[in-house]
């Protein structure tokens, strides 16, 4: 089972709470996954999902909360690796039942977006978002890219969901993917907050554990890369120093150098892999890293001058 499916399974098993919260959650599930049929002055709501726990939740809420007749049917897929789908058929008795779910207004017209009456309180907003995620949401495995989304084919509902999420400062945005409107969250901290308040505590812990391990691995990689870069710089500097010392030795000889420069030059030729600090500790008396670096710069400058003189002589000849 994927991380997303495990998260939904956990959310679908949360026990029902207050009536207002249950109504908000059912309204989101029906709005996202349901279709309304009207024939001969009678109504039917068909809610289709591939999740058995979600189907059971819709069934339970519609039956216990609104006391409506409900049927549940399984549609078995014949193709390999395809999940079964479940259709929960709800039979509202009156227009008022549909109004309670925020689907129709008093005139029987379809209501756009999310009716304010369903999400007045914080607990209702959380319940509605939980229902919306159960119906149309998904979350990436935290081992990969951080991404949580809820998809809908209704642009007004997408904007309303985004605003609802951003009441909790979750940085939600909306984009288009083919004919779908995608409400998404990218920041890992915001995803953690969302999982926490909708009640996916087990998923949250797993997400956090993976995130901590990823951060540790990234930090170690950064340190290794930094150490490697520093080592490469040290090696490059040592190679350059040896080349410059050899240029001086071949041109004027090391004996022509002042004693402090000659000593460090001879040590560098003898210990080409040593660090500046290690070279300084070999001197008598010992010299600090900055002192050794100063002497090496003097040798580099002298080598450059000798190279320039050599070029002029060759050019003149």
Curated annotation (Swiss-Prot):
GO: which molecular function terms? DNA binding
Hydrolase: present as a keyword of the record? no
Q: Which SUPFAM superfamilies match?
A: Homing endonucleases (SSF55608)
Return the annotated DNA-binding positions. Answer: 275-308
Q: A single GO BP annotation from the record?
A: regulation of sporulation
Alphabetically ordered keywords of this record: Cell cycle, Cell division, DNA-binding
InterPro entries recorded: Homing_endonucl, Sporu_reg_WhiA_N_dom, Sporulation_regulator_WhiA, Sporulation_regulator_WhiA_C, WhiA_LAGLIDADG_dom
Instruction: Give the superkingdom in one word.
Output: Bacteria
Function field: Involved in cell division and chromosome segregation.
Give the family, as the similarity comment puts it: Belongs to the WhiA family.
Write the protein's name.
Answer: Probable cell division protein WhiA
Organism equals Desulfitobacterium hafniense (strain DSM 10664 / DCB-2)
